[in-house]
Amino acid sequence: MLHPRARTMLLLSLPAVAIGIASSLILIVVMKIASVLQNLLWQRLPGTLGIAQDSPLWIIGVLTLTGIAVGLVIRFSQGHAGPDPACEPLIGAPVPPSALPGLIVALILGLAGGVSLGPEHPIMTVNIALAVAIGARLLPRVNRMEWTILASAGTIGALFGTPVAAALIFSQTLNGSSEVPLWDRLFAPLMAAAAGALTTGLFFHPHFSLPIAHYGQMEMTDILSGAIVAAIAIAAGMVAVWCLPRLHAMMNQMKNPVLVLGIGGFILGILGVIGGPVSLFKGLDEMQQMVANQAFSTSDYFLLAVIKLAALVVAAASGFRGGRIFPAVFVGVALGLMLHEHVPAVPAAITVSCAILGIVLVVTRDGWLSLFMAAVVVPNTTLLPLLCIVMLPAWLLLAGKPMMMVNRPKQQPPHDNV
């Protein structure tokens, strides 16, 4: 016979697995539709019209029209496409289900149109809202927070293709009760994360790891080098943190989301022309292209890092529906490659992983997630002790500093000005 603790853990196992699978399927469907639309906008249409895919007019035109289209969705859809991600954490309160169709359409348009944001925040919002709404009907005795945790874990597992990230993140948020062991509380979320990761793996495998030269043995000088790299990445990220609320306030003085997002799309188009096609989209596939291109110089990497960071700030400030983690990873990779090219004596594995750690820490203010992203992009067990040590001064630098989030004015409606 099972112990009562085991029976308690098993109560939410089936719902956890179902939520994990559903979270992954929603992500897969959204990404597939966005991929088809992206291929139409950036491959087939330019070819049919006889226009180069990297034509400045095409890049500016597509991104401007994408901004106008997203603005129309936010302006006229029920629920106004959910909350403004610039004002929300990654895991937030559930939104009304009526806002989800507009949010999904706005996300797909942004992903396909080349906006420098990832899918993580909108997908998380959709999955939490559905889990809470459906779960409250089927099992009303289970509180909303439980459904929120399961949906968040399932989504994290689906996004990163592994339950490890969910285990790390929730180990710090669920350890609030001394009476219930941590792993008892982690059981159902890890079931959801594992189900989400396995379901994603059946259809595609997220490619985070980069072909970077293997790092051999850690030396004391490497710790100092890594700490300096992380500090440089943090400094770059804090510039974006300073700019975001100010640009957000300036853009939203216009009140009309169609105008705001149209202008935002136009600015993104100009940035895309300067940075080239590799600086567009969420950044995961593009960072693979960046590493594979041996022709890039130190100045090229610097330009890509600056352009991508600026595009991230503009996209978030304009109200595009998307997340900030994936483009931040691209910025970290570009910064790391730039620093390695500038100082070849420091291995690329150190510069890239520590730059990712620093910039993701600025964006998420989550130490475990930052370590995870650095470790999966540069998969090398020798780096893990170094990353853990470098995390300490990085965390000290950010203690008490503002987050990359906009404080929503009290008079503003919950789903944007309209």
UniProtKB/Swiss-Prot annotation:
CDD domains associated with the record: Voltage_gated_ClC
HAMAP family in the record: CLC_YfeO (MF_01115)
Topological type in the membrane: Multi-pass membrane protein
Species of origin: Shigella boydii serotype 18 (strain CDC 3083-94 / BS512)
Alphabetized UniProt keyword annotations: Cell membrane, Ion channel, Ion transport, Membrane, Transmembrane, Transmembrane helix, Transport
InterPro entries noted in UniProt: Chloride_channel_YfeO, Cl-channel_core, ClC, ClC-type_chloride_channel
GO molecular-function terms, A-Z: chloride transmembrane transporter activity; monoatomic ion channel activity
Name assigned to this protein: Putative ion-transport protein YfeO
Entry annotated with the keyword GTP-binding: no
Superkingdom of origin organism: Bacteria
Stated family: Belongs to the chloride channel (TC 2.A.49) family.
Compartment(s) where it occurs, according to its Swiss-Prot or TrEMBL record: Cell membrane
GO cellular component: plasma membrane
Transmembrane stretches, start-end: 10-30, 54-74, 99-119, 120-140, 149-169, 186-206, 223-243, 258-278, 300-320, 322-342, 343-363, 371-391
Chief localization: membrane
